[in-house]
Amino acid sequence: MAVMGIQMVVTLLVASLMQRVSPHYSFGRWLLCNGSLFRYKHPTEEELRTLAGKQKPKAKKERRTNGVAEEKPLTVPKDIDLRLDTQPINTMDALVLRYFLEYQWFIDFALYSTIIYLFTEAYYCVVDAQNEINIGVLWCLMSIIFSIKVLFTVMKHYFRSEEGGERSVCMTFAFFFLLIAMIVTIVRDEYLEFGLEPGLASVCHNLENFLAQQGWQWSMPFVKLAFKIALVALCAFLGGCLTFPGLRLAQTHLDALKMAADRPMLQLLLHMSFLPPVIVVVLWIRPITRDFLLNAPMGKESVELMSNSAYNTFRLWIIVLLCLLRFCLTRFHLQAYLCLADRWVEQMKREAGRISMLEIQRKISRIFCYLTVVALQYLAPVILTFHCVFMLKSLGDYSWGLYPEPPGFSPVVDSSPVQSHSPTSEEEEDTEDVQAAVEQIMGVLTSLRGLFTPLFFRGIFSFLTWWVSVCQIITSLFGLYFHQYLGAS
């Protein structure tokens, strides 16, 4: 409590509130069950028999002729005039959804993490609390970890598929993203301004001083190589996890545009919500954005449109606003997915032959049961990007523009020995031994905390934010091509 102060109090209050309020009111549950989304109900066997012109099966005694039971008809023509009834999604309907509890907990946790982060930002604006641990950063870090965990859980679902096609798609894209990440990590900062190399150099310098203080020797080039290998492996893993979310986003985007054919303003917003990954990627390409804005050509002269700190703030706000825009259009994408049931029925009517009643019911029910999976695929990348930006701002010592940006610094590990007083008695000797041990432990913890500089955090979270957008661009563009040309053929 003394270390974190009021932040710990607010954290405990929010955690208690989350535990007590979530069973009664859940933001994630409200997103699905507020009455704006409607599902298509599958037809009963009696309705299908009526549409097919078949009589109701006779009683069990009447169906036996010469000791042989008459088989129950299970198929109907595909071209029957089937029209699906709709019903708003309520809480009881949502309980049968796949991964509904995981979805509800994840969305609620992301919301409370954002609330705590906003509180800590306001607290840091009012109070000089630079020596306190920023508890909001810890919540954002957990949101990032849970976002990746949710995406991995959904990806594992595809790996359990019996057909194996989804598994091959994920592995192919993961290997493809591995190659791209290997290329990106060797691009100089003059083109992609992540700042990974300066940040890694500062960490290695502090680590070398820390190890020398402990009497250890370590090869710094090996540390840099191991870090880059781990970063490339993480990029490939994220690429595999973001494969099907990107493909699904492309499908729901096309379907949402068809639903909004008579609403041009909504179509404009849908197009704008599809472009955020492209804008985020461009924001870190130095010759196109920062160099242009800092030295904009005006005739024969160059004009500085904004400063370096102003551009950093501008980039943070742009990403936050784009994430909020995509979040606000969640309902239209989810409804576009639910309308796949009606589209499938219309496609079935244009085909010849017969189809099982059970298959019709199963297909329509399956679309609704996977609604939360689609919601996680849509919202998890948004939440991941959103909280990566929060981490970039706080740990990278950036500013929202509401107060001056603190200067970046690279703390050097202090190698001075811990001072201790000479004991005067046995009791004082024991007490001072404990104090010396505590001081030594605190000194080691302080040194470990000083290893990771704001320059390093700027590099790592800039890269992660940029990489998530790259994965979304590639997978969603491939999804557009697949659903428009390959899927339609």
Swiss-Prot record:
Residues 120-134, 188-224, 286-304, 392-459 are cytoplasmic. GO terms for cellular component: membrane. Residues 413-432 are annotated as: Disordered. Pfam families: Tmemb_161AB. Residues 1-23 form the signal peptide. Belongs to the TMEM161 family. May play a role in protection against oxidative stress. This is Transmembrane protein 161A. It comes from Xenopus laevis (African clawed frog). The gene is tmem161a.
